Amino acid sequence: MTNIKVLDQDHGKMWYVYHGDCVDVARGIPESSVDFIIFSPPFESLYTYSNSDRDMGNCRSSLEFARHFRFLAKELYRILTPGRCMSVHCMDLPLSKQRDGVIGLRDFSGALVRIFERAGFVMHTPRVTIRKDPVTAMQRTKAIGLLWKQVKKDSCLSRMGVPDYLMTFRKPGTNPKPVHHTAEEFPVKQWQQWAECVWHDINPSNTLQKDSARDNEDERHIAPLQLQVIERAITMWTNPEDIVFTPFMGIGSEAYQAIKMGRRAIGIELKDSYYAQSVKNLRRAEDQQFSEQSLFA
């Protein structure tokens, strides 16, 4: 790493984390030095994570978010090893009459595809749909499109639940370290299940969650990516000891799972409480990893 401006940093044997702005920190990472990237970006202004001017979740419009996010996409392309992959977790975003003047959905996943393609990435997989229970979504959001009373009133405003997506992109070029699997560790039945474009078996509650990371009135939501999704992506597109990078680390879900699977991790987080909690989580993951290695040594 070249000299970078950070608020804080910490590390273990298998991980480095930086407390700061993801674009600033990413600029200090050497070119083609990361083997896999996985993250969940801020969903524009749908959720507010902090009151920082550098928080992309505080953008005033979709256009402003895209302008800021393009700087990061450029750095992600630069630091990723040729022939390697980047997985992005996202969802399409609700439009509200109060904020947007209409009720509907914004094609956020499509906007991300266009930003990453403009940066040089190739779309590697279709949008893998991760099913979410529409009843749970209705109870949490009270979205008019999911209410049964709206079906009775005027179902032209009724719609289906909004799923999560996992989209994977690839940096063109020859992969210098092919990712190999054996039939024993990756049986054909597992591949047939994972090759489906809709994943019905993801447990939405299997996340790295910690209430103590909530601290400010301006924060409304913690949305960690399901560990099961991270595990599948890391299994598919990395080798043991590869470097897994996440620019929006949150409380450390992607890095935590990477360490548990014998990979190295680099993460960046801007919010104070998330950063502090991620350090605790990564220390715990590393302790567990080395304890298991000692047990079977």
Predicted regions and their residues:
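Class I S-adenosyl-L-methionine-dependent methyltransferase module
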Residues: 111-112, 279-297
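Core catalytic lobe of class I
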Residues: 2-277
